[in-house]
Amino acid sequence: MICKDDHSTLRARFRGFYPVVVDVETAGLDANINALLEIAVATFKMDEYGWLCVDGSLNFHIKSFPGAIIQPESLAFNGIDLNSPLRAAVTEQEALHEIFEMVRQGIKTQGCSRAIIVAHNAFFDHSFLMAAVERVSFMEKNPFHPFVMFDTATLSGLVFGQTVLAKACACAGVFFDKNKAHSALYDTERTAMLFCELVNKWKRLGGWPLTPCCIES
């Protein structure tokens, strides 16, 4: 059977999935006991010629959940000052509500069925997001696929031979300021631009659309 979807749509390109970049900054490496401190997301759209581009973004500073463990070395690594009056932190519930509303609207607008996480070393970001979802009992509201994800570290290793975000961005022609790294919003924006280049490069090389398209036996 030949697919009838227009290949220039987001829906057709990712089999009905709606890709969303997610980046988190945390107070440790264990999603179940360490605090989620920042989260940012970025969404995508296709232009009329089927080139992927960044659509919008959203970010929040997060209040530590009750009983969360804060690792000082993690704060030193990401440079987060929990006592800064500029943080304007919100609860996990408030942040996820706003993010999920944005993502669900994008799914509807693009005619997709479900969101899929795009992240650099995606397992880490995915695990912290899903742990927060469970803490605030948003399982029914969660628009993201429970385990499928696009990992830009893996994709960059395949395409560019680089897995470090800054080096992969350099290969992709995406400017990366190392002084701004480990900000959830900045890393999300860079990862989104990197993902666009990975997808668009495959298109430029003739890898998409498939020929013949989506033939099913």
UniProtKB/Swiss-Prot annotation:
EC number of the protein: 3.1.13.-
Name of a matching Pfam family: RNase_T
GO molecular function terms attached to this record: 3'-5' exonuclease activity; magnesium ion binding; nucleic acid binding; RNA exonuclease activity, producing 5'-phosphomonoesters
Keyword line: Exonuclease, Hydrolase, Magnesium, Metal-binding, Nuclease, tRNA processing
Subunit field text: Homodimer.
Protein's job: Trims short 3' overhangs of a variety of RNA species, leaving a one or two nucleotide 3' overhang. Responsible for the end-turnover of tRNA: specifically removes the terminal AMP residue from uncharged tRNA (tRNA-C-C-A). Also appears to be involved in tRNA biosynthesis.
PANTHER family from the UniProt entry: DNA POLYMERASE III SUBUNIT EPSILON, RIBONUCLEASE T
The protein, known as: Ribonuclease T
Species assigned in the record: Blochmanniella pennsylvanica (strain BPEN)
Gene symbol of the encoding locus: rnt
